[in-house]
Amino acid sequence: MNIFKKIVMLPVGLALGLVGCSSGSSKTYVLTTTSFGYDPSYRPYIVRVNGEEVGGGFGAATKRSAIITGPQYITWGQTNIRKQHVAKNVPHLTKEDLKGKSYLAVHLYPDDRVEITLTEGRNMPDATKMGLEVRSKLIDELNESDKK
């Protein structure tokens, strides 16, 4: 029985070990992060990417955060009613996406979709054109409803 274990179990154990090594582990990058919330009816708070808190304040506040490659699960809170939001989509980041990047911005849209943008060097991320247009439209709608 002891010889059987050595003959059969050794190759099986080695094969399973190699499968684990080749499955493509995640790599962690430390980037300066921020977030932009485009819904004018509330301010997002405690924005998290894979459980790691990122900066906020519509790009004004930054934080150094550990970002891993692979799927990016994003959540955030809503200040006025203490609602917890979960992103409807799941962006994916690769090593190539993150290589040489300094900043990561999470963009939170009113329909709970998210977008991630990355910048190099000392170039701070900006709000997206789409986000600013959506925000402007919602502000106009809020102003119209206040007039009634």
Task: List each language-model region with its residue ranges.
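Structural motif
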Residues: T33-S41
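Bacterial signal peptide processing site
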Residues: S22-G24
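Short coil/turn motif common to extracellular beta-sandwich-like domains
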Residues: S26-T33
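C-terminal motif of bacterial Sec signal peptides marking the signal peptidase cleavage site
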Residues: G17-G20
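Beta-strand-rich cores of mature extracytoplasmic or soluble domains
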Residues: R82-K148
